[in-house]
Amino acid sequence: LLFAVSFSYSQRWNTPAENKIDNPVIKSIIDEATNNSQLENLAHELFDVVGPRLVGTPQMQQAHDWAVAKYNSWGIDAYNHEYGKWRGWERGITHIDMVEPRLRTLVGRQLAWSPSTKKKGVTAEVTLVPDIESKEDFENWLKTINGKFVLVSQYQPTGRSDSNWEEFALPESFEKMKNDREEMSRKWFSNLRLTGYGYRDINKAFEDAGAVGLISSYWSRVSGANKVFSARTDKIPNIDVNLEDYGALYRLAKNGKKPVVKVVATSTEHGVVPTFNTIAQIKGVEKPDEYVILSAHFDS
């Protein structure tokens, strides 16, 4: 599939002279990609039907079984090879509403392996880490977060990619935005260091201080796309919220407007489950003792 995509783009953009290829194998690959590509159908089945494929989830197992069945339908031997165990977990419903200072439904989802809220959810004020001068300042502030949601990510001044700014903004506007963003990032990491924690362990401090949940937003610097990794909490939910919604919560909290959100986040623990690699094999004829290995991440 990877070769098919690559050659298909080559066929589309190169001139006829540049595409003159005599090798029959390469010509066959180009013809297959150009005239018989199944990439869109396969992507639909895997992305739209199966969906996200976190290791240890039923969806990951569904994807493995789908791949084996698909290979078999092509006459290719395939099987799932168990290589270990993993934490079994499944994301359920995530619903987030801002209820103060106005009503607005927010776009977000649970981080991987996030604990659940109670069935009816939790409603609480949203706060953020203030600018501090010492670890003592931070420890004193921790005493104020009991029963609240905490914003744990850096605020982003824009949701547009740099390439979009470069194309549409004035050069001086683009340069100012980059400088402002770099300064915000410098101050954020400096403030984090003053807490005495790192980004891997600070969430535990929030949880131990009585926060009811954490709200994060890890922007990928591509319009509309966040990176969603794993929660680092044991008992409280960690919710990822889209950049624009996170920015609104941040500005409200920063300006003393005390936003309130209601979060319903359900998930299911499935205990320890087996994990697999899906392996398919097309046996060679000319050199049966040699291997060409094509591999890729199947989890997502």
Give, region by region, the residue ranges found by the protein language model.
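Extracytoplasmic/secreted proteins, especially bacterial periplasmic and envelope-associated proteins
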Residues: 21-28, 38-41, 45, 62, ...
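Solvent-exposed loop/turn segments at secondary-structure junctions
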Residues: 52-53, 84-88, 133-134, 156-159, ...
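Soluble metallo-hydrolase cores and metallopeptidase-like ectodomains found primarily
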Residues: 24-25, 115-139, 228-300
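Loop-rich non-cytosolic ectodomains and luminal regions
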Residues: 150, 186, 194, 198-199, ...
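Structural recognition of the beta-strand scaffold that forms the well-ordered cores
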Residues: 42-45, 79-80, 126-128, 149-153, ...
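Solvent-exposed, acidic/flexible segments
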Residues: 19-22, 32-40, 53-64, 192-199, ...
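Bacterial Sec-dependent N-terminal signal peptides
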Residues: 1-17
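Noncatalytic luminal/extracellular "stalk/propeptide" segments of secretory-pathway proteins
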Residues: 12-16, 22, 35, 44, ...
